[in-house]
Amino acid sequence: MHFVPTMGGLHHGHASLISAASCHKSGDVETLVSVFVNPLQFGPNEDFARYPRTFEADCELAELSGASAIWCPDESQIYPGGSAESWRIQAPKSLQSRLCGSTRPGHFDGVVTVVCRLLALAKPHQLFLGEKDWQQLTILRRMVLDLGLAVRVRGVPTVRDGDGLASSSRNRYLNAQQRQQGVLFAQVLSDARSACLHGGTALKPGEVKRRLEEVGLSVEYVDVVDPWFLQPSKSNQSSLTLLAAAVRCGSTRLIDHAFLMTRSPLVAIDGPAGAGKSTVTRAFAERLGLVYLDTGAMYRAVTWLVLEQGGDPGDSEAVDLVLNDLKVELEPLQQGVQVVRVNGHEVTDAIRDPRVTASVSAVASHACVRAAMTAQQQRMGKAGGLVAEGRDIGTAVFPDAELKVFLTATPKERARRRALDLEARGHEVPALPELEAQIVERDRLDSTREVAPLLQADDAIELISDGMSIDQVIDALEDLFRRRVGEEVWPTPV
């Protein structure tokens, strides 16, 4: 079951959520929409009593959007002992010390408490939430992760009305003049995003606040934070950050945000040989519409050419001579396969030969090779929109990548996979213990070489793939990506 929790007052934004949940259905999966105005989310003097309650209209919109059923529990079903006496979950302080959490104490504790209760009752497989309230989405993602709940969280892009104002149940409170102010609110944030993307310079929060006040808005906060940690970003300005703000138009509180970036997102996937990086990275790139940069293939291409010309992989001077005339080309993925060419010759299968595999570590250890390949890879990734896999992508090639993953598996598992790959390619398959010993030795060489050793970046997330299918690994990578990069920043291809 796919689940869309709401507080009612459904609008175009909710319709988009329900439609997304319905479009992801397969087989006998159903889409459930809940309507429950949660008292724990409202503070003193907030609008709990007058919050829109339009159940009949909600049912109609939900059905038209693809919902299988609508669930409208009463308070006693959600909080059997009453909301005042119910068990409560506390969201981490670091996730609610800024943005809306800084001015609405207890609000997100109420959100995580009710959603945890709804999930326990409904038991869905996937939970669909809007990216409009990014802080809420992030906190709920952390709740699911930290509590080990068996549900996958999916974010859906912010929906805007024709005039640019983000869809909200509270928009109906606005008169014509206030609505125009709300439109200007959205425009100021959009202008800040454009200035960063095209000019490379982000407006300071103080400047954004000044512009909002100039159009008559009462500003509650303007802040720039890391999209996952919801604290000021420590990365350089190439990385993605979240510009978020809350204002009041009359008595109506509005929130909105924009993602600031100077390029499209980058993903760096590192890990030891045989961890399945190439297989899953190719499929991940296709699913997300990212360009696939197979850096391992580039090093294999150099190694192949060295061997083809009779050179010694351990002789740096001989290898350097090969680099003078080297031209490596990686063609776009076609049905999961990336064609590799060296100086015009197609070598896609040749670079996977065991001779190349045995020598690639020695060739890649030369400083001249690393420098040449790193420079070429960085040129290819300058505009972003790319995923690369290798040994030092997150530490040397793209240290400012939005997502860094260290994908690994035990030597025994990697030996098993290597045997299957060799068999599929028609090569002779050594005994598994021999393959495992080769992998352990390769790890040692890669981790101890002087130039660009195999290392896990400090901010990389380790993903151990033993016992996981390829699809499960790709799902895990997609979820990690979406923690930081929303659908409204990089939409999943249809």
UniProtKB/Swiss-Prot annotation:
It holds the Pfam family Pantoate_ligase. One of its GO terms (molecular function) is CMP kinase activity. GO terms for cellular component: cytosol. It comes from the Bacteria. The keyword Kinase applies. ATP binds at residues 7-14, 130-133, 159, 167-170. Residues 1-258 are annotated as: Pantoate--beta-alanine ligase. Residues 259-494 are annotated as: Cytidylate kinase. (R)-pantoate binds at residues 41, 136. Beta-alanine binds at residue 41. GO terms for biological process: nucleobase-containing small molecule interconversion; pantothenate biosynthetic process; pyrimidine nucleotide metabolic process. Keywords: ATP-binding, Cytoplasm, Kinase, Ligase, Multifunctional enzyme, Nucleotide-binding, Pantothenate biosynthesis, Transferase. Pathway: Cofactor biosynthesis; (R)-pantothenate biosynthesis; (R)-pantothenate from (R)-pantoate and beta-alanine: step 1/1. NCBIfam families: cmk (TIGR00017), panC (TIGR00018), PRK13477.1 (NF010004). In the N-terminal section; belongs to the pantothenate synthetase family. Catalyzes the condensation of pantoate with beta-alanine in an ATP-dependent reaction via a pantoyl-adenylate intermediate. PANTHER family: CYTIDYLATE KINASE, CYTIDYLATE KINASE/PANTOATE-BETA-ALANINE LIGASE. This is Bifunctional pantoate ligase/cytidylate kinase. The gene is panC/cmk.
